[in-house]
Amino acid sequence: MAEITIRGAGIFGLSVAWACVQRGAVVQVIDPNGPAAGSSGGIVGALAPHVPENWNAKKAFQRDSLLMAEGFWQAVEQAGGGNAGYARKGRLQPVADDAALALAQQRAETAKALWQGQATWSVIRASDTPWQPDSPTGWLIHDT
């Protein structure tokens, strides 16, 4: 008999189930649509640190959680004998106008101090990337 029942076999539900099993729990996962059916409606499948201004404990917790992801997914791969598909590539966001560019540059400086090289927020030229979203200014934010 399961000690814990998790509803949802998407990335979050399966990750919670894995963490519970690692701690010795007996777990069952229930999802009427099957594993990874995409019913959560998420379109990105990615997480990134919060913007650096107004830094608080919640934002620090999310950043710290994201930093633990590499070790988590390595353990999943080792247990499963396959590639979990984890990659820390970052995301690209177009910069809309001069005001957004100034804000992005300010955030890059704040991120350096707060994230201490563990994650990055960079302002880069769109032309410097092999693929880029349309950017009215020709600039992108790349955060990891």
What role is predicted for each listed range?
Residues 2-28:
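N-terminal Rossmann-like FAD-binding beta1-loop-alpha1 element of flavoenzymes
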Residues 19-22, 33-91, 101-113:
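Conserved FAD-binding subdomain of flavin-dependent enzymes
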Residues 27-31, 73-77, 120-128:
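Short amphipathic alpha-helical surface micro-motifs
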Residues 83-144:
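Flavin (FAD/FMN) cofactor-binding and adjacent substrate-gating region
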